[in-house]
């Protein structure tokens, strides 16, 4: 019986050791990817924040009616959801999906969805939520190419009045262990009080290049969401894999203890049998 128990524990030790190798390797890969994603995030964030300041001044100077500021009359809402292509990243994806579900459950008929990432597509399909478009296999360092494709689709849907409001749903990165799901409204723009700078003059008039301004702003915004999402994904995966590796180490310690106790018991029993046999022969 003890021999069978020892064989079973050996198998478990081998299995857990193999799993630990995988989780440790994935943790190291995620750490390297996170480092790269954070550098990319800082670069994009500076560009995005500067563009926001410029856009605010431009919008505040527009006095004529404009659908990108005053709305287009449509009651449909578009949610662009940023998820990951790969799993094993803790609650990263499910937190985003849960936020979307809570947001659209009161008005499903007027809620439309564009999803980014294989995992988001899979979750939405299981929930029976149809999508207008799906974007997968996004590179670890997203570029303006991916952002431009999505931005053009958003502009097309909004300008054709298929949607009246556009929201970006993504995970804002703060640290490897802290991310927050945000639902950011990007269209129509919110007009604030007229700019304090009365000496700004646009030539030609802003309205003549509004479409170009809008596309560039959406590209910057989407790229910022991509950068936050990738950093959050890799931070979540690194944390999850490090936690799994720690759990595997704890389990191996317990299995080693069980193995040694069982082996000691088997040795003691064998010695007792030998001694007992010797006594019987006297």
From Swiss-Prot:
Annotated GO CC locations: plasma membrane; proton-transporting ATP synthase complex
Example GO biological process: proton motive force-driven plasma membrane ATP synthesis
Topology term for the membrane: Peripheral membrane protein
Record flagged with keyword Membrane: yes
CDD domains: F1-ATPase_gamma (cd12151)
Summary of subunit composition and partner proteins: F-type ATPases have 2 components, CF(1) - the catalytic core - and CF(0) - the membrane proton channel. CF(1) has five subunits: alpha(3), beta(3), gamma(1), delta(1), epsilon(1). CF(0) has three main subunits: a, b and c.
Role noted for this protein: Produces ATP from ADP in the presence of a proton gradient across the membrane. The gamma chain is believed to be important in regulating ATPase activity and the flow of protons through the CF(0) complex.
NCBIfam families membership: ATPsyn_F1gamma
UniProt-recorded name of the protein: ATP synthase gamma chain
Organism per entry: Clostridium botulinum (strain 657 / Type Ba4)
Top-level taxonomy: Bacteria, Bacillati, Bacillota, Clostridia, Eubacteriales
Gene expressing this chain: atpG
